[in-house]
């Protein structure tokens, strides 16, 4: 029997990345669920990026009554780099018991001028000036343009989801709750168990 996974997005790139990642390990049925992340269109900082991913995952698992909910957010997070931040994708996987695992994609530095705009809430493709490519967020992403297609947004998202699956695949004995991870990130996200009693 297939495991149902709800992705908290209406973005087909995120959907395909989650489908590819989960299909490596599970017989899976993936559904898209439109949810609010609780953060702006360009999240920045660990609290917003991790909090947004967790919120998407929680709302997806609750709304779809699925086995897993997956949330993905991208944005600059604090890290030792030229501008003090790197752009990354964070994936959160939440189960019916409100246990959460987190994974990150490969990350890259962002030009300081672009970073300043992103930290003010301007979406990356607009801040970089590549909006003329149209719909980058739902295609190769800025990373696809920057790497001439060697790495795409779907690749980054898929890798983040696979990283978030590791504790579940390896059977880690203790998986944190949504609230525990949110608190570590400086965010506030609540989850209520959807497991039938």
From Swiss-Prot:
One of its GO terms (molecular function) is ITPase activity. Binds 1 divalent metal cation per subunit; can use either Mg(2+) or Mn(2+). Substrate binds at residues 9-14. One of its GO terms (biological process) is thiamine metabolic process. Its cofactor is Mg(2+); Mn(2+). Keywords: Hydrolase, Magnesium, Manganese, Metal-binding, Nucleotide metabolism, Nucleotide-binding. Phosphatase that hydrolyzes non-canonical purine nucleotides such as XTP and ITP to their respective diphosphate derivatives. Probably excludes non-canonical purines from DNA/RNA precursor pool, thus preventing their incorporation into DNA/RNA and avoiding chromosomal lesions. This is Probable inosine/xanthosine triphosphatase. It comes from Aeropyrum pernix (strain ATCC 700893 / DSM 11879 / JCM 9820 / NBRC 100138 / K1).
């Amino acid at each position: 029997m297939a495991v149902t996974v709800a992705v908290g997005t209406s973005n087909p790139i995120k959907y395909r990345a989650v489908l590819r990642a989960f299909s490596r390990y599970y017989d899976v049925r993936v559904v898209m669920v439109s949810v609010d992340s609780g953060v702006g269109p360009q999240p920045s900082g660990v609290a917003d990026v991790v909090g947004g991913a967790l919120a998407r995952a929680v709302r997806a698992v609750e709304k779809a009554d699925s086995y897993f909910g997956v949330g993905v957010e991208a944005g600059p997070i604090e890290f030792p780099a030229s501008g003090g931040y790197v752009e990354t994708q964070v994936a959160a996987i939440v189960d019916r018991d409100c246990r959460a695992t987190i994974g990150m994609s490969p990350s890259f530095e962002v030009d300081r001028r672009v970073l300043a705009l992103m930290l003010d809430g301007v979406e990356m493709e607009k801040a970089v000036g590549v909006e003329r490519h149209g719909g980058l967020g739902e295609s190769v992403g800025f990373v696809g343009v920057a790497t001439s297609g060697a790495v795409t947004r779907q690749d980054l998202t898929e890798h983040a989801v696979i990283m978030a699956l590791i504790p579940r695949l390896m059977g880690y004995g203790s998986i944190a709750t949504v609230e525990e991870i949110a608190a570590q990130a400086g965010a506030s996200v609540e989850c209520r168990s959807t497991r039938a009693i």
